[in-house]
Amino acid sequence: MKKIYLCHDFSGIYDNVKLITDYIKVLISYDKNVSYISPVHLFGILYDKVDSSLYSEYCISLLKDCDMMIVFGEKSKTDECEYQINYCKKHNIPIIEYVDYCKNTLKNLQ
């Protein structure tokens, strides 16, 4: 099963968890044969409990096993997200915008 990493800002704002949950619901409605990996859902509870370098290591441990990354425009412009994006670039993990991914997926379903 394909694994796609969702690169979205958390910053300790729990409304972002709800927003990402809504994105995941849309993504799953398009393609149920993909595992959408959300570090915010997995590690959000650690956000203010561990230092940022350890938090980054947790995120990269997930990202390195993913086939692709989806970014969310301005919501992917934080230092943490940029670190993850740079990891993808360095390791040739494809990066695509959420809107473009949805358009491409819908096009392929037709």
Regions found by a protein language model. Give the residues of each.
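Conserved catalytic or regulatory cores that recognize and/or transform ribose-phosphate-containing ligands
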Residues: M1-Q110
